[in-house]
């Protein structure tokens, strides 16, 4: 792809395959010096651009913030209302199937919170509702849509892989030990 996004505390974009990058956002993290500690965080952890519209971008951070822009970064809006407060946005996905649908997965391990948090918005993140049902207490690390079936979501957790069918999650035995899944290629 010609366009590449890179996140630190700000979002950068290259329009020439990574030869040159330019910032397209302000600091999207909390930027709280009291929270930096020995291992700094407050960085962008997930970026997703809508396949329906260039410049409609969703950005999640490891300090629980989720922003969106509809104009390639000229203006940004915080869209965490309805999500868990301060929980790491481990993955944000703009749906390939339905315009305006966005999924957000959150991870609370930093706070000793091992629950599964997954939200869905049908309004580009304006409001969120929980779709956590069926996943046991296991932080969610990755969410992927099925490339052929709009009703299937794959969820990678600290205890393995789950499939969500019409928003009801089922455990999937793929022959592996319960293990942490952070990358989930779906072909």
Regions found by a protein language model. Name each.
Residues 1-187:
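Beta-propeller blade termini and top-face loops
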